[in-house]
Design a protein with these regions (language model features):
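A short glycine-rich beta-alpha junction/loop motif
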Residues: 77, 91-98, 129-152
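Short, solvent-exposed loop/turn positions at domain surfaces
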Residues: 1-3, 26, 61-62, 129
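DNA target-recognition patches
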Residues: 13-16, 26-59
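Non-catalytic DNA-recognition/assembly elements of restriction-modification systems
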Residues: 1-22, 47
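Histone-fold recognition with a strong bias for associated Lys/Arg-rich disordered tails
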Residues: 28, 141-142, 173
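A short beta-sheet element
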Residues: 41-43, 51-117
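Amphipathic alpha-helical segments with low aromatic content
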Residues: 1-8, 149-175
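Catalytic core of tubulin tyrosine ligase-like
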Residues: 122
Length: 175
């Protein structure tokens, strides 16, 4: 694929809204439900797109949790840096995760998801030394990424989405 336009460097905070997750009090059982929206923790991140989580927020829990829309890219920023996913539906997440809700008029969510591995590599390299690696919301917002035009983002995003779907299909195929 040849690119027609030059790529531009942008800070993640310029691409949309950055949200740090939170944990509604686990001592209030009414905040959680078997049929609520996903509430993602790093251990729930095992696919490129997340539709399920071990715990879900009830309607009441959604009033306390930080709820974001479908296509928000979730990036772990504490301890297990490098586990990234995109929400397949409206959801919420804990404080170990930052979410980027992209301005979809300018940025392709799946393209950004593919780029998120590069963000994680940068975060691992610059995370605070010590027993626990942490990249705070401000540092996350300041991370830079390279972006082609929206049309090219969409083409790249569609290519990788198709490739990821093919890989998933082959992984599920019995031997």
């Amino acid at each position: 694929m040849a690119f027609k336009y030059p790529w531009e460097q942008r800070k993640l905070g310029e691409l949309g809204t950055i949200t740090t997750g939170n944990t509604p009090s686990t001592s209030i059982t009414d905040y959680y439900s078997d049929d609520g929206i996903v509430w993602v923790t790093p251990t729930d991140i095992c696919e490129n797109i997340t539709f399920e989580s071990a715990r879900k927020l009830s309607d009441l829990g959604q009033q306390v949790g930080r709820v974001v829309p479908k296509n928000t890219i979730l990036v772990t920023c504490i301890a297990s840096i490098g586990k990234n996913t995109m929400l397949g539906n409206t959801g919420s997440f804990n404080q170990q995760i930052n979410g980027l809700t992209p301005n979809e008029n300018k940025y392709d969510p799946y393209f950004l998801l593919t780029e998120s591995a590069l963000w994680s590599a940068k975060m691992k390299g610059s995370a605070a030394a010590g027993t626990m690696q942490i990249v705070n919301r401000t540092e996350f917002s300041e991370l830079k990424t390279w972006l082609p035009s929206l049309i090219e983002q969409q083409a790249i995003g569609a290519f990788f989405k198709q490739l990821d779907n093919l890989i998933t299909l082959h992984q599920r195929k019995p031997l």
